[in-house]
Amino acid sequence: MVTPTKTYRSLAILGTASDVGKSIVATALCRIFRNAGIDVAPYKAQNMSNNSGVTPDGLEIGRAQIAQAEAACVVPTADMNPVLLKPNTDIGAQVVLQGRVCSNESAQGYFRDTSRWAEAARESLLRLKQKHELLVIEGAGSCAEMNLYPRDFVNFRTAREADAAVILVADIDRGGVFAQVVGTLAVIPPEDRALVKGVIINRFRGDSELFREGITMLEEMSGVPVLGVIPYFRHFAIDAEDAVPLSAKVDPAQEPETGKVGVAAIYFPHISNFTDLSPLEHDPSVTLHYLHHPKPLSAYKVLILPGSKNVRGDYAWLQQMGWEKEIRAFREAGGLVIGICGGYQMLGCSIADPYGVEGESGTTQTLGLLETETLLEQEKYLANSEGVLVGTSIKAFGYEIHNGRTTVGANCHPLMNIVARNNHPESDVDGVVSADGRVIGTYFHGIFNEPAVKQWFLQQADSTYTLQPHERGRQESYELLADHFRQHLDVNKLFELIDYEQSLLP
């Protein structure tokens, strides 16, 4: 382990509510501090999300912390997100502890005694502090849920253990920003209130000059300085943490725009890794719609069945909703059907769960659009993988997170040849393509991140599709995000909070 040559005071980014933008603020700050030459790392004690990824050493953490590590230019580790809760029912979740599946817990069971989870989180926090000069800590939900406060080890307890300066993030777009900030500060204990050193107002729309008086009023009412008002900005593609913002985009009334490739994605109750579709959502030549309720799909050229944290349960929902009829009609009309991970399993003939991995044991007969059968095994498979699309020289990069082992019949051929897993040479195959090429399944999450791979898939549906002359990469997106925040933050105050020598400011 390399000992940091300099240490700075940690920053904790806590929120007045869920989905106020804590993850994006933490990501921006990671890149801002990295650009100042600081060895910075992200940390979130507990994350509730079905958007997860795989670290280089084969462990599972939230996608948001992987994105933050990328922004900080450090290798993601399980210590950056020691407790990951992956909801698999309305009242329960799989617990991933320091990168490994630990147990399935009901909400009541999990919160009955959080000491085990809190101790693991504390161990990871201390290890990260020993390895890096600065930690940017992200809280969870509202930091002022007073009924949960004694058991909340993610927000102020973490801030106290890290001796962190707290920045409170509020979302002005949802309204009530004064009540958000002042109300939060009013209900938390005085010793925690004393840790709050600044407020960031996120997602401002319009002319920020019109809010200048509001800043003065908020500072007078709260006694805490406003570090910045961040305008609403959509021009970067960075992985989201959960499906809260996604729910606002489901079942749009309008059809896909003329001249664009229309892509429909089924919005399962337990959808997971919907970040797989981010490259499509941010492609100006694509219209992506998430659909919860079935409807005729003739206006679309591609239908995607994304990942699911409860595959058999979500397939039962799909049947009950009447989706089978629309999927089959779309396939028979020549549409391109793509399944990713759980969606891939649903495209096959059956999914067997003899061990009750996702709930009640049993076997579910599925769509039968691919000649495959899937067995859910007790051990979860995790890997960062690299492949080459069959019949091309196009390289694909992705990560695998699945309990399913899928066997393939004779009338299908592989989607890609696997050449490496976890940086070790590999000779294997992934995925399935139907005989006519209109149904494709893969276990690769992040399959569309590589522009050439995205182009290959979309050209199977629309031969006229071409990539934009300049597609922004992830690192460029982090720079764009950091620049946006620097323009609207009091950077001097920000660096002052971490005890950074002002003469060294970039």
From Swiss-Prot:
Upper lineage is: Bacteria, Pseudomonadati, Chlorobiota, Chlorobiia, Chlorobiales
Give the residues annotated as active site.
C341 (nucleophile), H445
**Role summary:** Catalyzes amidations at positions B, D, E, and G on adenosylcobyrinic A,C-diamide. NH(2) groups are provided by glutamine, and one molecule of ATP is hydrogenolyzed for each amidation.
- What are the UniProt keywords, alphabetically? Cobalamin biosynthesis, Glutamine amidotransferase
Q: Which family does it belong to?
A: Belongs to the CobB/CobQ family. CobQ subfamily.
Q: Where is each GATase cobBQ-type domain found?
A: 260-453
Question: Which Pfam families has this protein been placed in?
Answer: CbiA (PF01656), GATase_3 (PF07685)
Disulfide feature = none
Please report the name of this protein according to its UniProt entry: Cobyric acid synthase
| Source species | Chlorobium chlorochromatii (strain CaD3)
Task: Name the NCBIfam families on file.
Answer: cobQ, PRK00784.1
Q: In which pathway does it act?
A: Cofactor biosynthesis; adenosylcobalamin biosynthesis
Give the SUPFAM superfamilies listed for this entry: Class I glutamine amidotransferase-like (SSF52317), P-loop containing nucleoside triphosphate hydrolases (SSF52540)
Give the molecular function GO annotations.
ABC-type vitamin B12 transporter activity; catalytic activity
Instruction: List, alphabetically, the PANTHER family matched.
Output: COBYRIC ACID SYNTHASE (PTHR21343:SF1), DETHIOBIOTIN SYNTHETASE (PTHR21343)
Q: Which InterPro entries match?
A: Class_I_gatase-like, CobQ/CobB/MinD/ParA_Nub-bd_dom, CobQ_GATase1, CobQ_N, CobQ_synth, GATase_3, P-loop_NTPase
